[in-house]
Amino acid sequence: MKTLTQLHFDNRFARLGDTFSTQVSPQPLEAPRLVVASEAAMALLDLDPAEAEQALFAELFSGHKIWSTAEPRAMVYSGHQFGSYNPQLGDGRGLLLGEVVNEAGEYWDLHLKGAGKTPYSRMGDGRAVLRSSIREFLASEHLHALGIPSSRALCVTGSDTLVYRERPERGAMLLRLAPSHVRFGHFEFFYYTRQHGELKQLLEHVIEVHFPELLEHPEPFHMFFRTVLERTAALIARWQAYGFCHGVMNTDNMSILGITFDFGPYAFLDDFDARFICNHSDDTGRYSFENQVPIAHWNLAALAQALTPFVEVKVLRETMELFLPLYEAEWLDLMRRRLGFSQAEDGDAELIRRLLQLMQGSAVDYTRFFRELGERPAEQAVQRLREDFIDLQGFDAWAADYCARSAREGGDPVARQARMHAVNPKYILRNYLAQQAIEAAEKGDYAPVRELHAVLSRPFDEQPGMERYAERPPEWGKHLEISCSS
């Protein structure tokens, strides 16, 4: 294991030059202190967990000190926000400190969010508040634990620095880890500014460092797009299967790696509602839960447009047609597993559709339903769950078909339970739980957020004594809409 001073930087993106990013020094927070850290994320850098207890830890991740081999830079990009093109966005409050290479030879971007003003801050102050930093930390690590690809979060550093949003709040910084911070919007920026030479340079860079298997392909740029499309389809399938609503699927928030990126007003479904909108600012429901699939397709079309100088339009269009079948196959496989099926049958998609329709009509808790379905043999489980539904006739018909389908699977009931518990979490990050932990942290009590993080890092385990985190939300805690302000 390494100490903080032993981290090895090799800053490949910085070497692309000033056309792609601008060198900026972080602006330190006042009186920094550690709020919460992830040992699992620290392990990605081979960091000794004891390093989090050192004063240097908070100093490095609050802008007070910086590694001599780090090269903090703000990246430039653009993007479509709520369907409209914004010509220049860029890192307005975050800095790519550099790329750390671990013992396995893996590269990890260290990105300090809330590090102060940059040339791309526009009217913003470059800061992040404690509230949004905790939310991103919890979600990043929880999604990873659920098996949903995501950027990672090393730590949150709090401070005495005041930041003004709807009200005065405490400033904070989040240290985000990801193999790459390149977004769809990076390519859009160079396409729409007609910098096609730089666009090609960026494409060659990301293929060389992130998709080296494509280097020998006769059409690497086309295969890059296809790979991004495949990864995005798989990601969205996992979002939909586990009830995750991102809330701000702008193209500048879409990763080329197919990982969940840039957390804002996200939410997991409480009661199942396909039309759920988690973003208070999303008046039209563009980024509602049920729209995430078509929006991902739309965003991929925006990326495809940016690649037209190097890939034929016909080829891009044909590739776009792969998205929905890939998504549907991945989603159906996940949902089968959530229902306890290890084999495929032709009627499975319709069985799942009927279930979701019944859940929608009765406002059934999405996470608890699947967990409880695996607690007992199928016939006993559906009898227990029946009381959650309003349309009893419809549910009874579905339950009969489900039990018959389960019987055709055969197998040991104990093995079925283990199989289902491995894919159906007991614990999910509900917004009201995050809010309670945030309110305690804002008063200086970090124990609740640390405990919540620990529980959510093992979402499939029973964890005796932590059952309160698996309870149904109170009425006030359901369907919370979160502001974009952060």
Curated annotation (Swiss-Prot):
InterPro entries per the record?
SelO
Q: What's the superkingdom here? A: Bacteria
Cofactor(s) required, per the database record? Mg(2+); Mn(2+)
GO function term, MF aspect, one: AMPylase activity
Which of this chain's residues are annotated to bind Mg(2+)?
A: N253, D262
Keyword ATP-binding, does the record have it?
yes
Protein name, UniProt field: Protein nucleotidyltransferase YdiU
What gene name is given for the protein in this entry? Answer: ydiU
